[in-house]
């Protein structure tokens, strides 16, 4: 997507300074990937090796930050992997019906500036590739919805978090490929599923 739709990603590139190629873990199922992304350990260690959503019990970012006195919010879609595998942490959960409500809640939290970390999860593109194909009109519309949401979120950070240093991250959990049924899929150890891009933006504190 980065190579083929670079111009479409202009708002993301404008909001960040680093685009980093990442190889996600295998099997590239959503709960497996998020299990490793927020713990830093392999699936063998965090315990999720397929499309299942148990609560992860090993130490994670959602444990270490509260332990260090940081306040964390997780804003995500109901019944998603992110809404389930990191439950029972000392963080604030905002479980919303779908992406639009997630983004609006995240914007509200950014404006209040009461958290050290806000993790925001949207899922429309993944839903659309499974229902259709990776570059179908429906999937591409979802892709652009995610870009627009990130653009709004990062602009909100710039407007409301100028009193302290801030970082924004766009972090995909996996890629996807076309399966034998002509639908988008993932979960295999293949380049299209494993190779993704993460984008990092640093916003220094504005001094008087």
What does each model-found stretch correspond to?
Residues 1-208:
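Feature captures the catalytic ectodomains and active-site-proximal regions of enzymes
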């Amino acid at each position: 997507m980065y190579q083929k739709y670079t111009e479409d990603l202009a708002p993301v590139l404008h909001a960040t300074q680093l685009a980093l190629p990442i190889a996600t873990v295998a099997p590239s199922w959503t709960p497996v990937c998020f299990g490793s992304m927020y713990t830093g350990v392999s699936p063998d260690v965090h315990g999720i090796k397929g499309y299942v959503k148990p609560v992860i019990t090993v130490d994670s970012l959602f444990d270490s930050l509260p332990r260090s006195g940081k306040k964390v919010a997780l804003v995500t879609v109901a019944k998603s992997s992110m809404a389930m595998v990191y439950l029972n942490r000392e963080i604030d959960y905002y479980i919303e019906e779908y992406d639009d409500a997630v983004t609006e809640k995240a914007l509200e939290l950014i404006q209040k500036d009461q958290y050290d970390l806000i993790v925001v999860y949207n899922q429309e593109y993944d839903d659309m590739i499974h229902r259709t194909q990776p570059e179908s009109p429906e999937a591409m519309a979802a892709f652009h919805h995610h870009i627009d949401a990130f653009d709004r979120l990062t602009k909100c950070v710039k407007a409301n978090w100028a009193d302290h240093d801030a970082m924004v991250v766009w972090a995909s959990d996996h890629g996807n490929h076309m399966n034998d049924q002509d639908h988008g899929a993932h979960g295999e150890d293949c380049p299209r599923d494993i190779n993704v891009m993460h984008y990092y933006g640093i916003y220094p504190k504005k001094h008087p």
